[in-house]
A protein has these predicted regions:
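Cullin-RING E3 adaptor/co-adaptor recruitment helices
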Residues: 2-36, 40-45, 56-57, 83, ...
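Ankyrin repeat start-site detector
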Residues: 60, 93, 115, 146-148, ...
Length: 462
């Protein structure tokens, strides 16, 4: 596996008008020195010369040429890069990333990081196929990486599949490692980049190649980002389901652990379903003894939780911190309302989760009162609970007003016993403990009664 040259920043596609001086070609120092000599932009350029032979690429500060590269002006690129022109140039530009820098008198300021790129990187990352082809035909070094990444890394990041195909046809190394330790396949991180991944695999990119520091395979990356098509492709190509990264996560752990908005829950479910159906272990623990179920509950993905439980995940295993899956969902319920955390709580309880100690229910109410249905499912799992005046004081007045019917019924539980219907439900659930979900279909109950037995939501307690 080849190693890219050292750098202090990644290749860039930032506008060339930032951080550049002058309108000529000249040597300069960025984070490394690129010695060489060159005449003005429009004139033929001599090859590198000097007593030591090859001294490295020239730095380009010609704004006219840079503009041609960044805008994909093929005619201008052809005019500048004639047969005698130097092609392997280095462009210094500012990235979009800020960093703190220290100046004299102990003052610190935020400045844009200086980054190095090349004409090949610029055209490949922007999808300028004809310009890229012209540079390659003029002899551009396809694996040059002054900024720590090759043009192939840049093309995969930008999901420019045609450019990836062209670079590979000119001998680009599909196993090239960036300075951060990633191969091009790791940079296929958008839904549009699946064709880039397919091209890399067909040209020999290792499907299980691990990054150097995080030790993540491409399947870890795809699973964490919820890329269903990438996961399908990698699994068909023989990706290792149980490969562990530096924190002990398998791809299934990585998918379950990734925070995501409610609208992305379906994509993460599809990813987890593919992994589980391919044989991923549902109780694989990371270094903190977090299982996929713990992590899915932290992210309140009810469909993933149901999938893992249906595949045999142990509902009561503890993490290194002593938390079960139920603890995890109760800790985030108030902040994940769009994810409908009450569905996760109900799923866990129906699969036999050990309930919260009754003496801690007041604390749970304070923390989860923004999700009344979470409280409903939890309270209905007990035959009776001791409700005191403190319960009414624990809920903000605006929430009581917003969910008046539910909270009034909750607070009234301290004044009267639970209904006979509820007590019968608790008795049946207790008798079927450990096999509730297997037994319910055999009971042939009416749908409404079946839902009641499985803690269906009514927004009222009785």
């Amino acid at each position: 596996m080849s190693r890219a040259p050292s750098r202090s920043g990644a290749s860039t596609t930032r506008s060339p008008s930032l951080g550049l001086e002058g309108g000529d070609w000249r040597r300069g120092r960025a984070r490394a020195e690129w010695p060489g000599s060159c005449q003005s932009a429009g004139a033929p350029q001599p090859r590198r010369s000097g007593g030591g032979g090859d001294k490295g690429p020239l730095e380009c500060r010609d704004l006219v040429l840079q503009n041609a590269l960044y805008t994909g002006d093929l005619a201008a690129v052809q005019r500048h890069f004639s047969e005698r022109a130097e092609v392997d140039l280095v462009i210094q530009a500012e990235s979009q990333d800020l960093r703190w820098t220290s100046h004299k008198w102990g003052l610190w300021s935020l400045t844009y990081q200086q980054e190095l790129t090349t004409p090949l990187h610029v055209t490949a990352s922007r999808g300028y196929l004809d310009c890229l082809r012209h540079l390659l035909l003029r002899g551009a070094d396809v694996d040059l990486a002054p900024g720590g990444q090759t043009a192939l890394h840049a093309a995969c990041t930008a999901a420019t599949a045609d450019c990836v195909r062209l670079l590979l046809s000119f001998g680009a190394d599909p196993e090239a490692v960036s300075e951060d330790g990633f191969q091009p396949l790791h940079f296929c991180r958008s839904p549009e980049s699946v064709e880039c991944a397919r091209l890399l695999l067909s040209h020999g990119a290792p499907v299980n190649g691990a990054s150097e520091e995080e030790e993540e395979t491409p399947l870890h990356v795809a699973a964490r980002l919820g890329l269903t098509a990438h996961v399908r492709l990698l699994l068909r190509s023989g990706a290792d389901l149980e490969a562990k990264n530096a924190t002990g996560q398998t791809p299934l752990n990585a998918a379950c652990a990734q925070p995501h908005p409610a609208q992305a829950a379906g994509a993460y479910y599809d990813v987890c379903q593919q992994l589980v159906e391919a044989g991923a272990r549902v109780d694989s623990a990371d270094l903190d003894r977090q299982r996929p179920l713990h992590q899915a509950c932290k992210n309140a993905n009810a469909r993933v939780v149901a999938l893992l439980l249906a595949r045999g995940a142990n509902v009561n295993l503890m993490s290194y911190s002593g938390n079960t899956a139920l603890h995890n969902i109760l800790q985030v319920a108030a902040y994940k309302l769009e994810h409908r955390p009450e569905q996760v709580v109900r799923e866990l309880l129906n699969h036999g989760a050990v309930r919260v100690w009754p003496g801690a229910l007041l604390k749970v109410l304070r923390h989860c009162c923004a999700s009344p249905r979470t409280i409903e499912a939890l309270v209905n799992s007990y035959q009776r609970v001791r409700v005191t005046e403190e319960w009414a004081e624990a809920v903000p007045a605006e929430l009581v007003q917003q969910h008046a019917r539910f909270f009034q019924s909750l607070f009234s539980l301290g004044e009267s016993p639970r209904s006979l219907q509820h007590l019968a439900r608790c008795a049946l659930r207790s008798a079927l403990e450990g096999r509730l979900l297997q037994a319910v279909p055999e009971l042939r109950l009416p749908p409404a009664l079946r839902q009641f037995l499985l803690l269906g939501f009514e927004d009222v307690l009785y």
